[in-house]
């Protein structure tokens, strides 16, 4: 078993643990949590979740640990990864879920503390970080190549699978992406200071345009799309579930029915479990709790002039993404010698 510690027990950290608890054949064993909050608070937030509801599990806590269904997970609280007891706890893999230690220099502090490898639950910044998206390039994972790997962002995980299908079948020349994204913890719930002046505005009452590197990051996992995609995010007053709107110019003329056909086929075959397809007239809350990375909404696919293609895909930016973090961690575990 690969011994796992979670650094940062926020939205993704707790979703990761819930996803892992739902696996019956996991090669992972979560043994530790580092978070600024205390174990009793973290146990409460694990049990009661505004998006996911009450966790059906036997949960208890003391001053130093959380116990879930008889599994005791040690807890510590230290903002400096160099001080963490990863060596003492024999930690193999750290799930870096704070959103803070996203560079190689920052993430490898966990290695200096005794862990063997780090998986960042965010886009990595800078060199020497391997970026993998399950269903796109995770099959190329080489265990000895990187100490630090990244699961990219939730939006890249949504975009890359169906973007790859479009590129493979029609050839993407260039395009833009807009993600209409639920607000996150990196926004203010009331107007307050923030380095991004738009994210400084109250998240629950505004549409907040902001940057996203998701479109450009697709090139990290699909190299032939280097320099071909860009995009922005519109943060909206919903707490979960987001939707990607991709518009691309393609080399091979097509029609909407043909685009939907190849996407539906991929969802049922090569990308099954990662990509789903629907033509039902649904809304964002219908996709809450979906395990896949993206669900193409075929009813909204458009083609203009044969070579301009518009595809819409929904994603649960918390739960679906966290499922892929578990998947990637399982890939790491299976490659351990």
UniProtKB/Swiss-Prot annotation:
Its EC number is 1.2.1.59. NAD(+) binds at residues 11-12, 35, 79, 121, 317. It is found in: Cytoplasm. One of its GO terms (cellular component) is cytoplasm. The record marks 181 as: Activates thiol group during catalysis. GO terms for biological process: glucose metabolic process; glycolytic process. Pfam families: Gp_dh_C (PF02800), Gp_dh_N (PF00044). Keywords: Cytoplasm, Glycolysis, NAD, NADP, Nucleotide-binding, Oxidoreductase. GO terms for molecular function: glyceraldehyde-3-phosphate dehydrogenase (NAD+) (phosphorylating) activity; glyceraldehyde-3-phosphate dehydrogenase (NADP+) (phosphorylating) activity; NAD binding; NADP binding. The active site is at residue 154. It catalyses: D-glyceraldehyde 3-phosphate + phosphate + NADP(+) = (2R)-3-phospho-glyceroyl phosphate + NADPH + H(+); D-glyceraldehyde 3-phosphate + phosphate + NAD(+) = (2R)-3-phospho-glyceroyl phosphate + NADH + H(+). Its main location: cytoplasm. Pathway: Carbohydrate degradation; glycolysis; pyruvate from D-glyceraldehyde 3-phosphate: step 1/5. D-glyceraldehyde 3-phosphate binds at residues 153-155, 184, 199, 212-213, 235. Gene3D superfamilies: Dihydrodipicolinate Reductase, domain 2, NAD(P)-binding Rossmann-like Domain. InterPro entries: GlycerAld/Erythrose_P_DH, GlycerAld_3-P_DH_AS, GlycerAld_3-P_DH_cat, GlycerAld_3-P_DH_NAD(P)-bd, Glyceraldehyde-3-P_DH_1, NAD(P)-bd_dom_sf. NCBIfam families: GAPDH-I (TIGR01534), PRK07403.1 (NF005641). Involved in photosynthetic carbon assimilation. Catalyzes the NAD(P)-dependent oxidative phosphorylation of glyceraldehyde 3-phosphate (G3P) to 1,3-bisphosphoglycerate (BPG). The first reaction step involves the formation of a hemiacetal intermediate between G3P and a cysteine residue, and this hemiacetal intermediate is then oxidized to a thioester, with concomitant reduction of NAD to NADH. The reduced NADH is then exchanged with the second NAD, and the thioester is attacked by a nucleophilic inorganic phosphate to produce BPG. It can use both NADP and NAD. Belongs to the glyceraldehyde-3-phosphate dehydrogenase family. Homotetramer. This is Glyceraldehyde-3-phosphate dehydrogenase 2. It comes from Synechocystis sp. (strain ATCC 27184 / PCC 6803 / Kazusa). The gene is gap2.
């Amino acid at each position: 078993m690969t011994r796992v510690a979670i650094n940062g027990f926020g939205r993704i950290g707790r979703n990761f643990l819930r996803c892992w608890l739902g696996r019956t054949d996991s090669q992972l064993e979560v043994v530790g949590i580092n978070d600024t909050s205390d174990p009793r608070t973290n146990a409460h937030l694990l049990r009661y979740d505004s998006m996911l509801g009450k966790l059906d599990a036997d949960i208890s806590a003391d001053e130093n640990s959380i116990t879930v269904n008889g599994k005791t997970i040690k807890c510590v609280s230290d903002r400096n990864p160099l001080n963490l007891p990863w060596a003492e706890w024999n930690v193999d893999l750290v799930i870096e879920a704070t959103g803070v230690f996203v560079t190689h220099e920052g993430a490898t502090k966990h290695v200096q503390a005794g862990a063997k490898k780090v998986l960042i639950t965010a886009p990595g910044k800078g060199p020497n970080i391997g970026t993998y998206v399950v269903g796109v390039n995770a099959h190329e994972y080489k265990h000895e190549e990187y100490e630090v790997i990244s699961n990219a962002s939730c939006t890249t995980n949504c975009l890359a699978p169906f973007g790859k299908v479009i590129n493979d079948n029609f050839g993407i020349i260039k395009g833009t992406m807009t993600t209409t994204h639920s607000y996150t913890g990196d926004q203010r719930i009331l107007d307050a200071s923030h380095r991004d002046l738009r994210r400084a505005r109250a998240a629950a009452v505004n549409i907040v345009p902001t940057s996203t590197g998701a479109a450009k990051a697709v090139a990290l996992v699909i190299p032939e799309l280097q320099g071909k995609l860009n995009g922005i995010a519109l943060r909206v007053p919903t707490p979960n579930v987001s939707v990607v709107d991709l518009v691309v110019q393609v080399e091979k003329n097509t029609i909407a029915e043909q685009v939907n056909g190849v996407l539906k086929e991929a969802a049922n075959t090569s990308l099954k479990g990662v990509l789903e397809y629907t033509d039902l007239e649904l809304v964002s809350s219908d996709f809450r709790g979906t395990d896949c990375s993206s669900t193409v909404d075929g009813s909204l696919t458009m083609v203009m002039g044969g070579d301009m293609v518009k595809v819409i895909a929904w994603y649960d930016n918390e739960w679906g993404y966290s499922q892929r973090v578990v998947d990637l961690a399982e890939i790491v575990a299976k490659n351990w010698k």
